Amino acid sequence: MEIDCIIQARMGSERLPGKVLLDLTNGKKTIDFLFEQLESSELKKKIVAIPENSEDDILFEHLNNSKILCFRGSSLDVLDRFYCCSKEFSFKHIMRITGDNPLIDPDVVNEAINEYENSNCDYLTNSIRRTFPNGTEVEIFSSNSLEVAWKFARKKSEREHVTP
């Protein structure tokens, strides 16, 4: 079973604008650290899904210069951005990670993939009951589950988040 990854990222943030391109050390950005961590994971394709806003053009340029695949979509309807990205790349099973979490643990990623592959679930996460620190959350779901959520989400709160 192939598990692909969509990483949601944006430059706009009320608490810390531009945090995904924050220079953490020697020119290495937050998003770069995240991709370094994911290199040793069992994830197949990794796509960064960013808004179409002009403020995100700098992130788009950085990703292109770093040879990182990128998808641009709705700024406010993050569920639609994810759904359209999954369709564009024909993903069947998707891990969701946020781009401002450079300390994601590839062992946790691989353990989640293994658990998802060996279960008969449509959704798996390590964050329903908090046992992991903030910034290490992962979610895996089927493209079918994502499509159902996309079709039936009506409230603004259901569209601005990919999962509850």
Give a label for each model feature.
Residues 15, 103, 140:
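Short aromatic/basic micro-patch
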Residues 75-76, 101-103:
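Acidic metal-phosphate-binding loop of nucleotide-sugar-dependent transferases
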Residues 141-164:
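Active-site oxyanion/phosphate-handling segment shared across diverse enzymes
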Residues 105-131:
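Conserved donor-nucleotide/metal-binding helix-loop-beta segment in metal-dependent transferases, i.e.
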Residues 16-39:
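Short, well-formed alpha-helical segments that are part of the catalytic scaffolds
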Residues 1-17:
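N-terminal nucleotide-binding beta1-loop-alpha1 segment
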Residues 93-97:
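Short aromatic-hydrophobic micro-motifs that form the base-stacking/packing surface
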Residues 31-92:
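Conserved N-terminal catalytic core of the sugar/cofactor nucleotidyltransferase
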